[in-house]
Amino acid sequence: MTATDLVAALRPVVEAFDSLGVQYFLGGSVASSAHGVARASLDADVVADLDASKVDRLARQLAGAYYVPVEQMHTAAVDRRSFNLIHLATMFKIDVFVSKGRPFDRSAADRARRHAIGELGDGAFFVASAEDTVLAKLEWFRLGGETSERQWWDIVGLLRVGADTDRPYLRHWAETLGVNDLLDRAWIDAGHQI
């Protein structure tokens, strides 16, 4: 999957979010790559503060260009879960995680900044900060039974390349999210002092 395909798959989705006033940001491997830890992926993770009242309009805007599971979208918006969109032209999968609305989620959304995706700077999308990407990956790592080497090395890689990492911010949210022990371990694996 090329960066051009990624941009082609993401642009209509984020434009639809923008037109509906839905705050969003990219996370996962796309965010890791934007912060210097490149990893190929066949999907993109998007966190969106999607209200159930906007699902039908979102589905109408994306219909024809995407596989749009309207019922799953409604359920995800109500239950604050996830759903998948598939861009039919590229078969690129977009995992949309409806924001849980926790203080951490609101903080991550507020700290997201625009980043260009691809070698030509195609498409500027809101991307989670490096710190929020680390914290989200620590949460996923814990929820997954602490077994995903890919997640772990993304976390360690982000800490290695992040010379200007906001340590007090990381520490505050790691404590709040219950992943402080994992953050300590990741700092050590990244070759830093705790």
Model regions: which residues?
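Compositionally biased terminal segments of proteins
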Residues: 1-194
